């Protein structure tokens, strides 16, 4: 008889589940726009069944996408178990925009999808295929819970997209479904687990102190983070036009900026693309505040921005003060540059170039890692997350990826 399988969620992931409410969501979403390519039909739509066939063929490579939640009896802690009754039709769905669907109509549809809570009784993801977009294109909106999206074996986009325009259609294989424990078995396994942490803790402590240099670096890093956090707690964020309580509704919009223009700004002011984006954002926010008939000199705006470390596997949320009160664009750039240079000097950070230089595009996973760092933004009012785009054309079995956008969960 096969051994039962389950995986206990980390305390951090369990917190994401507990923090959700009728107004607060803990999932991220990606919007991808493709040319119809080989999926185009004579009626002007897309061949949804062919897309379904491709996704279904890739699922055996992504066991995480078949995992659903269970609760440990009495304890209540969530665990992952394989869904014995997994049905792709509950996760891959088809809809249509009124032709020719505009960007604005796509954003309204994405807003409704982002506002809807994922079904806790099933694996925590879904994907919408929207046909009817102007130019004969179609869109995919992939929504995934933060407790799932960062895990290995859950990056659906990395599996679906390829640099090979003529990639062959994968053949579907039978997925391995591992037996889930009964409530009694799950409770028994957790009782055993609770008796073993003391032995594991001793082993971790011995490994930690066997490397004094590593121990010193970790202690210094924790001390820096504590001091920084205390500093911001002493001086909390002031009032801003973005203060207020969350509603159950969402409104999503897209503003495109040519990357070449951003690069020119970066070359002029120095620093990184991220610095240039912050400079552009600060100027735009100053004009926005002025449009509300509010003096920018009275506004204290801070952005919480996740910074990926050099491995690209973890991120910390840093608070950047956006000097909207400063009228001079050059001075705003200098003030922002001082902050970002200090951050980079204190931590080994990943560059956008290094994160995007691999053979596969992992934007969805990097986006999820960054979103996880945005637990709460009480020290700021805005979130700014940089996730590099693909450095080469990507295709969904011949359909070219033309545009991609991310949706972060709102925090209060």
Spans of features found by a protein language model:
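Soluble acyl-CoA-dependent acyltransferase catalytic core bearing the H(X)4D motif
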Residues: 1-13, 31-46, 50-412
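Acidic, low-complexity proline/glycine-rich segments
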Residues: 11-23
């Amino acid at each position: 008889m096969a051994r039962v399988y389950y995986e206990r969620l980390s305390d951090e992931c369990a917190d994401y589940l507990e923090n959700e409410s009728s107004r607060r969501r803990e999932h991220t979403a990606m919007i991808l726009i493709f040319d119809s390519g080989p999926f185009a039909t004579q009626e002007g739509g897309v061949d949804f069944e062919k897309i379904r066939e491709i996704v279904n063929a890739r699922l055996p490579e992504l066991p995480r996408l078949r995992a659903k939640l269970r609760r440990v009896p009495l304890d209540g802690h969530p665990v992952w178990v394989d869904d014995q009754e997994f049905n792709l039709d509950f996760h891959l769905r088809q809809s249509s925009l009124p032709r020719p669907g505009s960007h604005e109509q796509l954003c309204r549809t994405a807003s409704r999808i982002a506002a809807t809570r994922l079904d806790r009784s099933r694996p925590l993801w879904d994907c919408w295929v929207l046909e009817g977009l102007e130019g004969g294109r179609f869109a995919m909106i992939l929504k995934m819970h933060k407790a799932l999206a960062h895990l290995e074996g859950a990056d659906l986009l990395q599996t679906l997209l390829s640099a090979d325009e003529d990639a062959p259609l994968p053949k579907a294989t039978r997925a391995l479904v591992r037996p889930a424990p009964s409530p009694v078995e799950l409770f028994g396994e957790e009782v055993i687990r609770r008796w073993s942490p003391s032995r594991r803790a001793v082993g971790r402590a011995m490994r930690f102190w066997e490397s004094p240099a590593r121990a010193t670096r970790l202690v210094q890093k924790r001390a820096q983070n504590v001091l920084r956090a205390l500093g911001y707690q002493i001086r909390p964020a002031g009032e801003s036009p973005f203060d207020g309580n969350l509603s159950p509704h969402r409104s999503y919009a897209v503003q495109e900026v040519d990357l070449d223009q951003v690069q020119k700004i970066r070359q002029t002011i120095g620093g990184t693309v991220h610095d240039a984006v912050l400079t552009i954002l600060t100027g735009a926010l100053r004009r926005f505040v002025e449009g509300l008939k509010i003096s920018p000199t009275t506004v204290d705006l801070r952005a919480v921005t996740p910074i990926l470390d050099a491995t690209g596997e973890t991120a910390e949320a840093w608070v950047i003060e956006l000097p909207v009160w400063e009228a001079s664009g050059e001075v705003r750039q200098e003030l922002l540059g001082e902050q970002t240079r200090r951050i980079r000097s204190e931590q080994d950070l990943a560059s956008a170039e290094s994160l995007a230089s691999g053979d596969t595009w992992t934007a969805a996973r990097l986006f999820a890692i960054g979103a996880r760092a945005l637990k709460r933004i009480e020290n700021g009012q805005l979130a700014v997350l940089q996730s590099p785009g693909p450095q080469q054309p990507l295709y969904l079995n011949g359909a070219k990826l033309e545009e991609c956008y991310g949706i972060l969960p709102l925090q209060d």
